[in-house]
């Protein structure tokens, strides 16, 4: 910490600006990192940010994303990064080093141990991109105990109240994000012209130095930021690009040359604009009174799960959304507007006694909650309609969404068509391939709706969420992110649940009307968990009702090709929320698999995580094979073609029904219809035909 303070003191005495340089550890090769660190110092870097690679860097642009991907392929983990710092120190590195990255690898390593080991390795502090302020107070205290700095981030969107709080927990400097959006720079794009105003606003609350990053690539841009009043200039993406452009053996020299050029090392001292570094001292200290600025108006956690683990740029947008949702759900006129759309969405959905399925099971009555009969073919329309009304309340004109199976994409594009809003759907390239029908449906809904395939990672739902969040942070002023499942940072899990809980409310009323009782068991498939939390929520206080969530077991949970997050995962942080996730020992998110695109996700809603840990709900797995058996069973016994997602719940529901007496009642949420999956199954069936003893002629299917 003291070394960082000393840098800024020396620069102030020289009327100069500190150069803060970022690189990703292990990029492009593991053995390049130490020479690159030394080259940064030789080229004029006063402080170095060393990036800890993460599988899902939602705040970063394409350049840093690629560097993270390459570094992970080079087996770079937290202990390796610390080892590189030790080696660099031994070889003469004296510049302060800040470890910069995302929270989950730290959480997996152990927060206390991560801080202690960093200090022992020679690091000087941390920048945690997605560590929320509420957590940061405790984290900062632990850092201070090891003489390490905690560097908070402030964005152009940060409110004065939050600036006051964030300034109060800064000890060495504050990282000021110059623009909304992800990391990245261009020599042809000017730095934000509002930067002087942003810096002046922050200086009203702190005397701590301010270092500005995002968007700086050239010496002229460096000087502009310095003249705007910055005490330091952060450059990252441009350095990573220089590394990429270098040939084998040339990386250190390329890095040093660029750093010399941009920092002006070796050139005559440059006089900054008058008044560039004026400061207003502050006596603020971190305390409970200051921290009140970040309190939530709706409960942000379910036990230990939930929260807002997001980049600073998103915090105020989430607060705006939370306030709008609270206002809406307390407004009878809002719910009247929602209910007025039931004739459009075909609510209430029917509760159907599956007599043939019941007879097949030979046990409890099997009831199907027919969400598949909703407009657009699934439960997703419930949430889409609710959120589109929220978006209109806060004046958004552009809607983005992620989708896996495509059902949420279709529902979102549908409501955008109805309300005349622009619509962009992010979908993993693999899901685009296996859900081609839904892609066509989305794009058929009008010129304002289109699908953007995502080619990163496993090219599935997780990666679509990453890209949607990057879009949102870049376009907050006009855009609402219409999250499709009960995932993501607060208040998204609560919002989605509130618009899906109609499922359980209707089940309770409908079964009481025909049976005069509560169901004994309710069953729903679980990916992110929207249809399941909608089914379960109204029954949580009813202890006599067993709640069963069915996860995607893929090819079996004895291997890694599954999506059984609650059954096989561990608590961690992904996509802005603390919940159960599928991760390796280093805290990197692992690729998942399911025959159903909608369940192919390595996380789950935080309320499900709480229901699991509290014992209120049971979560089991259903393999691809058994899901196909469930699909076939319902199709041939009842003449109802279910979505592959719902087929997981069908299989488990019938299995449970077999174990119960005939006077019991089990309700299965049939979350969607299977039209979208028919082509995929026709392609898969030859592989499964003998194992399932299911031979269907495909002569009627046109060849491609």
Swiss-Prot record:
Residues 1-292 are annotated as: Tryptophan synthase alpha chain. The keyword Transit peptide does not apply. Residues 293-704 are annotated as: Tryptophan synthase beta chain. Its cofactor is pyridoxal 5'-phosphate. It catalyses: (1S,2R)-1-C-(indol-3-yl)glycerol 3-phosphate + L-serine = D-glyceraldehyde 3-phosphate + L-tryptophan + H2O. Keywords: Amino-acid biosynthesis, Aromatic amino acid biosynthesis, Lyase, Pyridoxal phosphate, Tryptophan biosynthesis. The modification N6-(pyridoxal phosphate)lysine is found at residue 380. One of its GO terms (cellular component) is cytoplasm. GO terms for molecular function: tryptophan synthase activity. InterPro entries: Aldolase_TIM, RibuloseP-bd_barrel, Trp_synth_b_CS, Trp_synth_beta, Trp_synth_beta/beta-like, Trp_synthase_alpha_AS, Trp_synthase_suA, TrpB-like_PALP. The active site is at residues 49, 60. PROSITE patterns: TRP_SYNTHASE_ALPHA, TRP_SYNTHASE_BETA. Pathway: Amino-acid biosynthesis; L-tryptophan biosynthesis; L-tryptophan from chorismate: step 5/5. It holds the Pfam family Trp_syntA. The keyword Ribosomal protein does not apply. Its EC number is 4.2.1.20. In the N-terminal section; belongs to the TrpA family. HAMAP family: Trp_synth_alpha, Trp_synth_beta. This is Tryptophan synthase. The lineage of its organism: Eukaryota, Fungi, Dikarya, Basidiomycota, Agaricomycotina. The gene is TRP-1.
């Amino acid at each position: 910490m003291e070394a960082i303070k000393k840098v800024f003191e020396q620069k102030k005495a020289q009327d100069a600006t500190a150069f803060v340089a970022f690189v990703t550890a292990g990029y492009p090769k593991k053995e390049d990192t130490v020479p690159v660190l030394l080259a940064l110092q030789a080229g004029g870097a006063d402080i170095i940010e060393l990036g800890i690679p993460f599988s899902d860097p939602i705040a970063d642009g394409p350049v840093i994303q690629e560097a993270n991907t390459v570094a992970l392929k080079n087996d770079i983990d937290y202990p390796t990064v610390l080892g590189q710092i030790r080696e660099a120190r031994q070889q003469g590195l004296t510049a302060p080093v800040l470890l910069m990255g995302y929270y989950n690898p730290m959480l997996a390593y152990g927060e206390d141990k991560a801080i202690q080991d960093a200090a022992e390795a020679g690091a000087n502090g941390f920048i945690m991109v997605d560590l929320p302020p509420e957590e940061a107070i405790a984290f900062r205290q632990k850092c201070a105990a090891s003489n390490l700095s905690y560097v908070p981030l402030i964005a152009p969107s940060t409110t004065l109240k939050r600036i006051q709080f964030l300034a109060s927990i800064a000890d060495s400097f504050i990282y000021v994000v110059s623009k909304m959006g992800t990391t990245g720079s261009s020599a042809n794009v000017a730095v934000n012209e509002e930067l002087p105003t942003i810096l002046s606003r922050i200086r009203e609350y702190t005397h701590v130095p301010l270092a500005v990053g995002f968007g700086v690539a050239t010496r002229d841009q460096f000087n502009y930021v310095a003249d705007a009043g910055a005490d330091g200039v952060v450059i990252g993406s441009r350095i990573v690009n220089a590394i990429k452009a270098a040939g084998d053996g040339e990386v250190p020299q390329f890095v040093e040359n660029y750093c010399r050029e941009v920092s002006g090392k070796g050139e005559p001292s440059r006089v900054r604009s008058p008044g560039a570094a004026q400061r207003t001292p502050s006596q603020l200290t971190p305390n409970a009174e200051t921290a009140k600025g970040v309190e939530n108006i709706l409960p942000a956690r379910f036990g230990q799960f939930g929260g807002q683990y997001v980049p600073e740029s998103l915090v105020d947008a989430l607060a705006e959304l939370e306030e709008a949702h609270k206002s809406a759900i307390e407004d009878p006129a809002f719910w009247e507007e929602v209910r007025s759309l039931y004739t459009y969405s075909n609510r209430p959905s029917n509760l159907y006694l599956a007599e043939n399925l019941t007879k097949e099971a030979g046990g409890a009555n099997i009831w199907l909650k027919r969400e598949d009969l909703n407009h657009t073919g699934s439960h997703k329309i419930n949430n889409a309609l609710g959120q589109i009304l929220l978006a209109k309340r806060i004046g958004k004109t552009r809607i983005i969404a992620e989708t896996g199976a495509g059902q949420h994409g279709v529902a979102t594009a549908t409501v955008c068509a109805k309300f005349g809003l622009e619509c962009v759907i992010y979908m993993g390239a693999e899901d685009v391939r296996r859900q081609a029908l839904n892609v066509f449906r989305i794009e058929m809904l009008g010129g304002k709706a289109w699908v953007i395939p995502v080619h990163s990672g496993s090219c599935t739902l997780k990666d679509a969420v990453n890209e949607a969040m990057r879009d949102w942070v870049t376009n907050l002023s006009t855009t609402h992110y219409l999250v499709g499942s009960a995932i993501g940072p607060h208040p998204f899990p609560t919002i989605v649940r509130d618009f899906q809980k109609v499922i359980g409310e209707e089940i309770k009323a409908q079964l009481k009307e025909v049976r005069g009782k509560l169901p004994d068991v309710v069953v729903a498939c679980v990916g992110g968990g929207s249809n399941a939390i909608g089914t379960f929520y109204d029954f949580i206080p009813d202890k006599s009702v067993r709640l069963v969530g069915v996860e995607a077991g893929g090819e079996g949970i004895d291997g890694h090709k599954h999506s059984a997050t609650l059954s096989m995962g561990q608590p961690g942080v992904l996509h802005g929320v603390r919940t159960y996730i599928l991760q390796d020992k280093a805290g990197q998110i692992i690729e998942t698999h399911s025959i159903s695109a909608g369940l192919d996700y390595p996380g789950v809603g935080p309320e499900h995580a709480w229901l699991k840990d509290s014992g209120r709900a049971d979560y089991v797995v259903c393999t691809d094979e058994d899901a196909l058996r469930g699909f076939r069973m319902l199709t041939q016994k009842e003449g109802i073609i279910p979505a592959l997602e719902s087929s997981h719940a069908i299989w488990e529901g019938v299995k449970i029904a077999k174990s119960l007496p005939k006077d019991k009642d089990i309700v299965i949420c049939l979350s969607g219809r299977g039209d979208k999956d028919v082509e995929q199954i026709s392609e898969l069936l030859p592989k499964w035909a003998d194992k399932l003893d299911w031979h269907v002629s495909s002569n009627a299917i046109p060849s491609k």
